[in-house]
Every structure is written in C-alpha cells, then in structure tokens.
Swiss-Prot record:
Gene3D superfamilies (UniProt xref): P-loop containing nucleotide triphosphate hydrolases
Protein name: Hemin import ATP-binding protein HmuV
One Pfam family cited in the UniProt record for this chain: ABC_tran
EC number: 7.6.2.-
Topology in membrane: Peripheral membrane protein
Sequence similarity: Belongs to the ABC transporter superfamily. Heme (hemin) importer (TC 3.A.1.14.5) family.
TM regions (residue ranges): none
Broad enzyme group: translocase
Residue ranges that the Swiss-Prot or TrEMBL entry lists as coiled coil: none
GO CC term (a single one): plasma membrane
UniProt KW keywords: ATP-binding, Cell inner membrane, Cell membrane, Membrane, Nucleotide-binding, Translocase, Transport
Single GO molecular function: ATP hydrolysis activity
Species of the source: Idiomarina loihiensis (strain ATCC BAA-735 / DSM 15497 / L2-TR)
Self-association state and partner proteins as the record states: The complex is composed of two ATP-binding proteins (HmuV), two transmembrane proteins (HmuU) and a solute-binding protein (HmuT).
Amino acid sequence: MLDIDVSNLSIGRQQVLTSLNLSLEAHQFVAIVGENGAGKSTFLNMLAGELPYNGSIYLNGRELNSWDALKLAPIRAVMEQHQAAPEGLSVKELVAMGRYWSQESDADAEQRATQWLSRFDLTPMGERGIETLSGGEQQRAHLARCLCQLDKDLPGEQLLLLDEPTSALDVYHQHAVLHEIKSFSQKGNLVLSVMHDLNLASLYADQVIVLGNNCIQHVDSPESVFREDILERTYRTPVHVSSHPSFLKPMIFTEPRH
C-alpha cells in the first residue's frame, strides 16, 4: 500500500533523514518512535506532502506527488502535532471540514460530523467555539475531523498520519482514541503515528519504526523492537522490559538518573 524509497530528506541545507527504504501493507497500526530530534515529525511531514524528498513514495501504486489534491483527500488524512484551532468555527464545523472533498450536501456532511463527535465524546461541545476547548478536547476534535474526512461507505487502503495524537489526553481518552485508531486500521487501512509513550505503542501497534542517527534503525513487531538493548541504545538511558500480565505485551520502565 505504501512504498518508500527515499535517498535523503533535507530541510534547507541540513540533511535530516537518509536511506528511507520501507514497504507497509494495509491492516496495520504502525508506531514511529525515537528520541527528540530523530526525525519522527519530519518523516511524517514528508508523507503528508509538506517536504520535498529525493526518491519515490508510492501510495496505492501511484507516486504521492502525482495525486490530485481532491482525489487524495478521501485517501490520506493528516493530524499534525500542533494543529491550529481556527477561531470562529464551532467544534461541529471543524469536524465537518473533513468533508470538503465530497459532493455530498451540507446536511449529509453535518450528519457524518455528528457521528464522529459522538464517537470521540464531543457531542456536548459540538456548538462551542473550537478555541474554547481544552488542549485534549481540541486534540480529539482534530482527530474526529481526520476520520470524518476518511469516512467512506466502502473503506479500505486509506492512510492516516498522526503526530502524537494522545499527548494531551487523560488515561481514559488515550485508550478510547487509540481504540478508534486501531479499529480504523483493522478495516483495511494503514495508520502511521508518532508516539512517545512506548507502553501505549506496545499495546496498540502492529509494527514499530525506530528512528535514530538520521535513518530507520528497526522495523518490526513491538515484541521484537522493545528490547532492553535496543531501547537503551535508542534513548541512552537504563531500561527494564517486562511482560504485561494480561496482554503479554512488552512493558517498558526507565530508571531515574542518579
């Protein structure tokens, strides 16, 4: 579904990432991890079409840069790390903006938006201005907009790009949101999400991409990647890995510095 063969990616004169060779199939939730400055957001921005690259990126067999914007809209949606919240829009209007590509009526767009407001526990806030919401509520609203954008009668082979989608959420909403994202991937779609919480990545991701030293260091299952030697090398801090008693997934504990 997504084939990446990029020799290098630069911002200005600074080379940020090199040797990006990767093929990812649908039906997957893929977490992108690595320390600050490893290029996680840059990698995601490249896939969002916001940065030029040397090489090729194919989405569903077609070069990413050759897609018409309106035809790409129902196939790829992006939630940035610091998503702007335009003043003057209600929460429902923001979510309905995801339907800009469609030919449906305003009433149909509003109906879909209403459904996604409910799924993200935002119905009581639908008529409020987006700027009045807390950071976590705004984060859920922008994610609802992305999934409203990708809401099709026959879903499949769609790409959802997320940059730290749970960073401002409480524990309840972290799991509620990740459940929705996981469900979306299981319907034949591909999710790539930058994540700093390794334990959430372990619980929800099917694969993990580890970035470091300007390139991809590892691509594998959480069980294969979340090992003490790999994590200590990646994050330069002592790490202990055990197994979750119920889900048998790696659980990561870091040690404080003395």
